[in-house]
Amino acid sequence: GFCAQKGIKCHDIHCCTNLKCVREGSNRVCRKA
């Protein structure tokens, strides 16, 4: 199904290809791997 683009919160959805879920403050967002 869906994947999260760069800058999108990834706590309830996985990141798109070549992105990784990283913690930023109290959120987790997708950033370049």
From Swiss-Prot:
Disulfide bonds: 3-16, 10-21, 15-30
One Gene Ontology cellular component: extracellular region
Subcellular location: Secreted
Keyword annotations from UniProtKB, A to Z: Disulfide bond, Knottin, Secreted
Tissue specificity remark: Expressed by the venom gland.
Keyword Calcium belongs to the record: no
First-listed, main subcellular location of the protein, grouped into a coarse class: secreted
Recorded family membership: Belongs to the neurotoxin 33 family.
Free-text note regarding domains: The presence of a 'disulfide through disulfide knot' structurally defines this protein as a knottin.
Protein task: Non-toxic to mice.
Protein name: U23-ctenitoxin-Pn1a
Organism: Phoneutria nigriventer (Brazilian armed spider)
